Amino acid sequence: MFAAMPVNEFNQKRFPPFSSASHSAARHLDSMTPLQEIIQQRKLTALFQPILNLKTGEFYGYEGLIRGPSDSPLHSPINLFGAAAQQNLSLEVEMLSRQIVLETFVQLNLPGSLFLNVSPETLLHPSFKNGCTLDFIKKLGLSPERVVIEITENQPTYDFAGMRTALLHYRAMGFQIAIDDLGEGFSSLRLWSELRPEFIKID
């Protein structure tokens, strides 16, 4: 089992958007919701929480966490992802979060493995199965063997067969699997039994 240490925030430069915002997009900025503006401007910050092996006490890697703008009610991940669910933007926020965590992990040249949070909803989404995450980390020069897909338990799932199939796909590409907070949340023992993760993380 692996335990999470207190969160550390690293100094980092802001990464530019994937493509330059057009003038027309700028004109429409005022009509966006705060969450849409966060997505458009990539106003998310990555934090990294050290992960230790409970058996040996040795450092293993980091869990990548995400925060909204510090001056926004959406700074808290609970508020950020809650708003995303209400506005049907969960996939967009999670994918952007993943990209920023990966970019920052590489930029800071952090050692060890990166535990990357993935919700069951996103794991089962067709767009998550097309290799975009693998392509993205390869462009960053990061090996998939250093990335652990950490299944979050912030929402229930009962499609265990679908999750097994999806995780077989990612294991075949070199990723490992972790479950967050075994013993808490929904059906965690069933999830462990069905998915057989390489890691169990305890906060």
Where are these regions (language model features)?
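The catalytic core of metal-dependent phosphodiesterases that act on cyclic dinucleotides
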Residues: 137-203
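Short acidic-capped amphipathic helix/loop micro-motif used as an active-site/signal-coupling element
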Residues: 70-74, 98, 181
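Conserved protein-kinase N-lobe ATP-binding Lys motif
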Residues: 70, 83-88, 118-123
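Catalytic core of bacterial c-di-GMP phosphodiesterases, primarily the EAL and HD-GYP domains
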Residues: 91-162
